[in-house]
Amino acid sequence: DLFEKRCWLIQAESPRKILRDSLQKIGAQIILTPVYRNVPVEVDYTFLLAELEQQKLDWILFASPSAVQNFHQILPSGFWESLAAEPKIACLGKITAKAVRDFGWSVQAAPYIQDFEHLVQSLCEINSQISVKYE
């Protein structure tokens, strides 16, 4: 029981509110402390954008909604829409998959059990099905 228990929630500067809201619903007193910021790294993404354009990437894997947001920020305006074929996207879980879908992109893999082991298993299963189709 967490009613009136003080909980220190250490998180990103712009966090998902699910945990905080869940704790507050059961009466916990939340102290929020942001300790890091999710922002795109300043590097040259030209190589990867070219890989996307030339359909040389089999999958794009996202492990968090902030990764999706930051990826979207590095894309030049209209880039995704200009791709000849949309790349396959895999997400660690349903919240990350929702972030992908919010941009209008399709998700091909998002395991029900949200951990890396099941994500890899999902990718292997999907790739096996694709291989069988083309044999």
Task: State each model region's role.
Residues 1-135:
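Conserved beta-alpha
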